[in-house]
């Protein structure tokens, strides 16, 4: 049962301010927009200043780990070595790898090579070869706060076709980011991502998308990219989520490896690419917290 907040009561956000001096006008605007049929966020999706500060500290570890991998990933390296780097660096800095034991996932990182769309298992048997593209997806818990981002890496002499896929996927993220602003919609961002991929002859995975993040590994809302401008949930200050489209060189169809129920592949065996950033909606735009 919801309890009505009085104008002079402490605001629900935890700022310590009176409701009338903090989020009352905000809530009234949200209620008006909801009355017009739009999907609006609940209060629990809006982070306060203390939570944002804690999340930013977690992001520092995540960025440092990916920066290190970017400098040291190389041909001949196996992906189990990447997993060890992620575990060792994260724990040395006081964090916990968020994927480790998450819903039974047995590793500290996801390493997805070529036609692997996401959730690739690190392995001593997966040795990086010249011509490979790989997504390294790192997620960190620090003092109960979560961060999540991924980058693509080209190993050795990569074909122009694969390089273009990697570059266009990054452009999709950048174009989607430009659409993130308060009182816009997730559909604005999703359509920008989808349209750029489609214009370049690619497809965007439908079944897997971005998500809210910060207090949990995966929070609402689910963030899709086959959406229309002006649709989906409203973007408001304090929301934190990932933009992480998975863009396929060929057909959109994917499948999950039945041997482990984790690793996702393209149905046609053609490469897939993904970049992931973590974004905060601010009062006047957005801030990228993790990349």
Predicted region positions:
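Short, intrinsically disordered linker segments that flank or connect zinc-binding domains
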Residues: 1-3
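Active-site neighborhoods and metal-handling regions in enzymes and metal-associated proteins
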Residues: 6-8, 15-291
């Amino acid at each position: 049962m919801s309890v009505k907040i009085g104008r002079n009561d402490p605001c629900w956000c935890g700022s310590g301010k009176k409701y009338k001096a903090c989020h009352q006008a905000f809530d009234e605007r949200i209620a008006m927009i909801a009355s017009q049929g739009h999907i609006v966020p609940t209060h629990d999706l809006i982070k306060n200043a203390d939570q944002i500060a804690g999340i930013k500290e977690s992001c520092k570890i995540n960025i440092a780990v990916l920066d290190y991998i970017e400098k040291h990933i190389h041909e001949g390296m196996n992906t189990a070595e990447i997993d060890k780097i992620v575990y060792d660096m994260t724990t040395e800095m006081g964090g916990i790898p968020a994927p480790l034991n998450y819903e039974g996932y047995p590793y500290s990182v996801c390493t997805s090579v070529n036609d692997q769309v996401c959730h690739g298992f690190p392995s001593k048997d997966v040795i990086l070869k010249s011509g490979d593209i790989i997504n390294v997806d790192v997620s960190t818990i620090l003092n109960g706060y979560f961060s999540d981002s991924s980058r693509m890496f080209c190993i050795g002499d990569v074909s122009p076709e694969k390089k273009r896929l990697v570059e266009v996927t990054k452009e999709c993220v950048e174009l989607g980011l430009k659409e993130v602003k308060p009182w816009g919609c997730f559909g604005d961002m999703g359509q920008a991502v989808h349209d750029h991929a489609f214009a370049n002859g690619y497809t965007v995975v439908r079944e897997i998308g971005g998500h809210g993040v910060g207090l949990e590994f995966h929070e609402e809302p689910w963030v899709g990219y086959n959406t229309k401008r002006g649709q989906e949930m409203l973007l408001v200050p304090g929301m934190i989520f990932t933009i992480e489209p998975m863009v396929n060189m060929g057909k959109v169809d994917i499948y999950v490896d039945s041997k482990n129920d984790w690793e996702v592949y393209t149905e046609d065996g053609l490469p897939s690419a993904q970049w992931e950033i973590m974004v905060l909606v601010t009062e006047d735009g957005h801030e990228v917290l993790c990349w």
